[in-house]
């Protein structure tokens, strides 16, 4: 509405339709609050889609309560989510390549098709000629990181219900999910105990920052702000580079990391601070020359977690990989150059076990 002529350009929203048009009132909220709210909504919706996939697969196992079946299904869901995210985030070269691959098969043929795809995603390019791949499969990248390495998982018969659940998930935009929230929602959605209690449980981003900000993040931001006050450019550049190296030298441990939301949000916060450093160092200039040069020094290898639940640990790894991908995209916008995410180059140091016994 134009406040000078309020009678013009007025948008009227009936109270019953408010939930469909809430975005029109975003101006009443802080931009950051609006963004976090959208990320929460997206991540919860994504969690529900994963829940549908999980339930549809679970019905097909001969012994759905067995440890082997549940472990296999957990790994399968993590892989499927990674593929869904990768095609929307541009990590797979062709748009909708995974959804398109799934769509072309009848349910009875989908199981071997998935097994073939997982094999390809775990095979380095030099080893692929031995697989005699179709052009379609050859187009998928090598992922690395061990996500698709275990060939011992059980994939049951795939039904039309499963294919429909995958198709529905394929229509969702996974690119903008919050890995901090989604990791916890994902684990909560598929955790049998939590499911019986009927809800999704996670620590909000706001509450995570109530812990990490006073612990170390506020001090780091203040140090960065102080560097920006340096008037001599050569000295300022030197201090910025030293500060970036300092961030890259920090190590973090969560001895009961769950689905990794504290580690993931800490990583994102440090990478955003690093991007601020790069923005100052680059000053809007395009980098030419060595295409192998990587401006990023903060790595997920600096983050360690211990988790007794193997599935939560797998989710934590995936959340950190998604966070790494999203932050790399933000860095590309800062340094104005393309950076390759795949194959995965950083180790995720999430260890499965009892922290009191390790």
Positions of predicted regions on the chain:
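Short amphipathic alpha-helical leader/targeting segments
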Residues: 95, 225, 280, 330-331
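Short, charged, amphipathic alpha-helix that recurs within catalytic cores of restriction-modification
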Residues: 1-11, 281
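Surface-exposed acidic, glycine/proline-enriched linker/cap segments
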Residues: 232-240, 245, 279-298
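SAM-dependent nucleic-acid methyltransferase catalytic core
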Residues: 285-304, 308-358
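Post-Walker A helix-loop "phosphate-sensing" segment adjacent to the P-loop in P-loop NTPases
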Residues: 272-277
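Preference for the N-terminal adenyl/adenosyl cofactor-binding alpha/beta module
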Residues: 1, 12-269, 302, 306-315, ...
